[in-house]
């Protein structure tokens, strides 16, 4: 397609969505309150309508109608309200909702939090303009996620297996290496390659990453961009960056723009998309700021009462759809304020998502990477993504036994601090030995170490051989007979 044809297609796409009503312009700003602009004497304002605000110096900002009361309209300005002059600001009501241009050309590009290119490249030639709230997916047409994604990280693959189409957050805290873990998952993620069985859609053309950053510092944005460039996957990555010095309110639309792009890539281009959203805590704080400006009744810790619903509108945009080959797997990252898992943000997130990966400060302080604490971590869809034909028949039993031994080992460690090592039984000493080796050999691994799920399971068996057969009560006798002997090579 040459440039002229492309331009013609672009014009057709725009005119297809053209709203025929005349656009009305007002100069009736009656007040500015935080990120909100209040307009009077507006004829038929519509909820969620997009408004273009032209400032006295000629700059144009966009906003969205949040509230309508008679002829009054409350507009949330995405780029912030600094410099808006009540007398000289022109407000044009577009009569349309917020749509974003989408195209396969978005891969390899960098956008700001409002979806404008910031990589000095040309604007996107839109294949379509999609509503950023997403298409409602009929629950009946959703497919249960059943293909395991191999991340190459033992603590995730064996203990908290992720299925393609799952939403699973990383619960972290300030100063912990959650970005490194997310980058490692992006680098290494792929389907499990079973011996003697080829994976049809495993080729890299079929895989895309959509990365949305909200309120992150320049260092984090640079880290991810550099990591994608270094491992050669940048042409399959679409970045949306709202940095810490960008407007707070923009953070409310950034994840929605990213997910709209992901839905297009997954359901129209049939790609398998991995969506990384960081940092959801910044998003929730932006939500609180808007809520406070609207003088709504606050909920827990000042967050709005509808935060649960709002977070669900983001997290639920993951999964698989009948008749389409693509999928969306979501890994939101959130930093728990003061390492508090009962804080409203991680608390509500845990209710919506299908498990969580818990990054632990104590493990990090002991120089263990990745510091994933497997006890509070969970993957609710693991049971259907593992087992014979998908990974290996001993997978769930090994996982259960490792959990049990690690939990008992933690109890023994706490007891040892009280009564001393001399008072422990021989069995207790075995659990202590297991605890140390589990953290050192199983959880701990290199930044670029990509273990297959079979290698990880074999490491698990090496650790379980610390115990005599009789103590491994979670594993059936048939599995023990096959895998427990030292000379078994599977």
Curated annotation (Swiss-Prot):
Keywords: ATP-binding, Hydrogen ion transport, Ion transport, Nucleotide-binding, Transport. Pfam families: ATP-synt_ab, ATP-synt_ab_N, ATP-synt_VA_C. One of its GO terms (molecular function) is proton-transporting ATPase activity, rotational mechanism. Disruption phenotype: RNAi-mediated knockdown in the wing results in planar cell polarity (PCP) defects including misorientation of hairs, multiple wing hairs and defective venation. Non-catalytic subunit of the V1 complex of vacuolar(H+)-ATPase (V-ATPase), a multisubunit enzyme composed of a peripheral complex (V1) that hydrolyzes ATP and a membrane integral complex (V0) that translocates protons. V-ATPase is responsible for acidifying and maintaining the pH of intracellular compartments and in some cell types, is targeted to the plasma membrane, where it is responsible for acidifying the extracellular environment. Essential for the proper assembly and activity of V-ATPase. PANTHER family: V-TYPE PROTON ATPASE SUBUNIT B. NCBIfam families: PRK04196.1, V-ATPase_V1_B. HAMAP family: ATP_synth_B_arch. This is V-type proton ATPase subunit B. The lineage of its organism: Eukaryota, Metazoa, Ecdysozoa, Arthropoda, Hexapoda. The gene is Vha55.
């Amino acid at each position: 397609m040459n440039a002229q044809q492309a331009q013609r297609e672009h014009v057709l796409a725009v005119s297809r969505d053209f709203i025929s009503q005349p656009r009305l312009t007002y100069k009736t700003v009656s007040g500015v309150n935080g990120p909100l602009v209040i307009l009077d004497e507006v004829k038929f304002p519509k909820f969620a309508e997009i408004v273009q605000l032209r400032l006295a110096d000629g700059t144009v900002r966009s906003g969205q109608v949040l509230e309508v009361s008679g002829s009054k309209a409350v507009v949330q300005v995405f780029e912030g309200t600094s410099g808006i002059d009540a007398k000289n600001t022109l407000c044009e009501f577009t009569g349309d909702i917020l749509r974003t241009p989408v195209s396969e050309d978005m891969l390899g590009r960098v956008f700001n939090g409002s979806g404008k290119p910031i990589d000095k490249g040309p604007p996107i030639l839109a294949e379509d303009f999609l509503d950023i709230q997403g298409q409602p997916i009929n629950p009946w047409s959703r497919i249960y996620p059943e293909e395991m994604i191999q991340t190459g990280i033992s603590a995730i693959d064996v203990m908290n297996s992720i299925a393609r189409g799952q939403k699973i957050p990383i619960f972290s805290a300030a100063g912990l290496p959650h970005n490194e873990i997310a980058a490692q998952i992006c680098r290494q993620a792929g389907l499990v390659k079973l011996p003697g069985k080829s994976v049809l859609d495993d080729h890299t053309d079929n895989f895309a990453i959509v990365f949305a950053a909200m309120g992150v510092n320049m260092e984090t944005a640079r880290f991810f961009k550099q990591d994608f460039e270094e491992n050669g996957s940048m042409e399959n990555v679409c970045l949306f960056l709202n940095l810490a010095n960008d407007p707070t309110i923009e953070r409310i639309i950034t994840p929605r723009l990213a997910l709209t792009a992901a839905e297009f890539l997954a359901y129209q281009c049939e790609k398998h998309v991995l969506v990384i959203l960081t940092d959801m805590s910044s998003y929730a704080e932006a939500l609180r700021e808007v809520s406070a400006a609207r003088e709504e009744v606050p909920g827990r810790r000042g967050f709005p009462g509808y935060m649960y619903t709002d977070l669900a509108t983001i997290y639920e945009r993951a999964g698989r759809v009948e008749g389409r080959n693509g999928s969306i797997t979501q890994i939101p990252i959130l930093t728990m304020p003061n390492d508090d898992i009962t804080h409203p943000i991680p608390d509500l997130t845990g209710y919506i998502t299908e498990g969580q990966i818990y990054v632990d400060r104590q493990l990090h302080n002991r120089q263990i990477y990745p510091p994933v604490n497997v006890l509070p971590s969970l993957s609710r869809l693991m049971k259907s993504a593992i087992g014979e034909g998908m990974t290996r028949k001993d997978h769930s039993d090994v996982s259960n036994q490792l959990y049990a031994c690690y939990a008992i080992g933690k109890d023994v460690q706490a007891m040892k601090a009280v009564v001393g090592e001399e008072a422990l039984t021989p069995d207790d000493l075995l659990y202590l030995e297991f605890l140390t080796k589990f953290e050192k050999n199983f959880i701990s691994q290199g930044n670029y170490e990509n273990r297959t799920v079979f290698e990880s399971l074999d490491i698990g068996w090496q650790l379980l051989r610390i115990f005599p057969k009789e103590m491994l009560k979670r594993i059936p006798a048939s599995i023990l007979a096959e895998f427990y002997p030292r000379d078994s090579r599977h």
